[in-house]
């Protein structure tokens, strides 16, 4: 057993030291994936069935006519956030060219020459721009995931332009501007859905910080043996996800894995762990995952995570007092966001919820 663990660490280290990620393996024309990427046999099905989108489909909410249909839209958000934890939004106000340009920028960076990308490769999370493969490469007990990523905190203190690669610099600033606007609206609508004043969640700094996490999922020669992203829930208040048309995102709903089918121009919204906690389970943060890419072209996704600040601080959060009563007492102890975030990343994406540690 000790030898196997040592071998796994050595192989992960050797993979990491190439600084070229999963894209480097594809460029080397491999036909079999390295064993560090292999899931335990049978774990992909996890004894939980897949269901087609004809059986289940996550809610789609149209923001067109929001000024005249606000109450109706708030009701739909309340239902989606409490029963699904996810919904897709269309006519959200972010121009299609902005969505396309950020996807193109992510692709351009990940398809740069290796010597260019290597200059940004780091495992130091304090850097303004962090490029690597699997943030939890050394901490997760699960297999290595079939994807490469880069991350950058865009608010409250935006990076200097020269901190970002030329390939995606302009697109990241423009996209982030639109994400902050949409995030502002979503937190207003969620506050109203909870029966609170519209600025309640914003006043708690729930959207003060914005982290862009941009994934590149190369085609996989053995997609049934590995996974793109392990099942997990998000350590944020709210996440806005832009996915391309390849698909592969699934959420866990009523003991089944349900496909989140791509809709051109739509954005996927999901509730994070922090929002579930402060609402005392009135909204839910659900597990989701990404299957390994079966397509002939790479899958691109851009996740915008909203939290309190650029770096998690020791702000303490607990369930909102207005949402508690004698019949609905607090279900969670207060959390220190910095402590929570450090524990979440130390645990890695291992398929277990970290929020459960804070249940009373």
UniProtKB/Swiss-Prot annotation:
Q: Which family does it belong to?
A: Belongs to the iron/ascorbate-dependent oxidoreductase family.
What tissues harbor this protein? Answer: Constitutively expressed in leaves and blades.
Q: Which organism is it from?
A: Arabidopsis thaliana
Q: What is this protein called?
A: 1-aminocyclopropane-1-carboxylate oxidase homolog 6
Does the UniProt entry include the keyword Iron?
A: yes
Sites binding Fe cation sit at: 232, 234, 288
Record-linked Pfam families: 2OG-FeII_Oxy (PF03171), DIOX_N (PF14226)
Question: Where in the numbering of this chain does the Fe2OG dioxygenase domain appear?
Answer: 208-309
Q: Name one GO molecular function term.
A: dioxygenase activity
């Amino acid at each position: 057993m000790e030898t196997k663990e040592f071998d796994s660490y050595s192989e992960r280290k050797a993979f990491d030291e190439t600084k070229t990620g999963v894209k480097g393996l594809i460029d080397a024309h491999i036909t079999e994936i390295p064993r560090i990427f292999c899931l335990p046999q049978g774990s992909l099905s996890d004894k939980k069935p897949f269901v087609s989108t004809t059986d289940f489909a996550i809610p789609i909410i149209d923001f067109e006519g929001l000024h005249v249909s606000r109450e109706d839209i708030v009701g739909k958000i309340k239902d989606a956030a409490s029963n699904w934890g996810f919904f897709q939004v269309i006519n959200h106000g972010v121009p299609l060219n902005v969505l396309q340009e950020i996807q193109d920028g992510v692709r351009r960076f990940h398809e740069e020459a290796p010597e260019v990308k290597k200059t940004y490769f780091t495992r130091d999370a304090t850097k303004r721009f962090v490029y690597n493969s699997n943030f939890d490469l050394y901490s997760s007990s699960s297999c290595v995931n079939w994807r490469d990523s880069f991350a950058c905190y865009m608010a409250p203190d935006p990076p200097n332009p020269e901190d970002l690669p030329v390939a995606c610099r302009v697109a990241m600033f423009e996209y982030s501007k639109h994400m902050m606007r949409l995030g502002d609206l979503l937190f207003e609508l969620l506050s109203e859905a909870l029966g609170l004043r519209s600025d309640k969640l914003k006043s708690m700094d729930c959207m003060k910080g914005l982290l862009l996490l941009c994934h590149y999922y190369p085609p996989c020669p053995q997609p049934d043996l590995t996974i793109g992203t392990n099942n997990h829930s998000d350590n944020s208040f709210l996440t806005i996800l832009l996915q391309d048309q390849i698909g592969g995102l699934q959420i866990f709903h009523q003991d089944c894995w349900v496909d989140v089918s791509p809709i051109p121009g739509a954005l996927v919204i999901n509730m994070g762990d922090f929002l579930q906690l402060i609402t005392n389970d009135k909204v839910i943060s659900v597990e989701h995952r990404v299957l390994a890419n079966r397509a002939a072209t790479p899958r691109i996704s851009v996740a915008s995570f909203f939290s309190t600040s650029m770096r998690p601080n020791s702000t303490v959060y607990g369930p909102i007092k207005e949402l508690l009563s004698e019949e609905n007492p607090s279900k969670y102890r207060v959390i220190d966001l910095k402590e929570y975030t450090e524990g979440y990343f130390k645990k890695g994406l291992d398929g277990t919820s970290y929020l459960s540690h804070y249940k009373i």
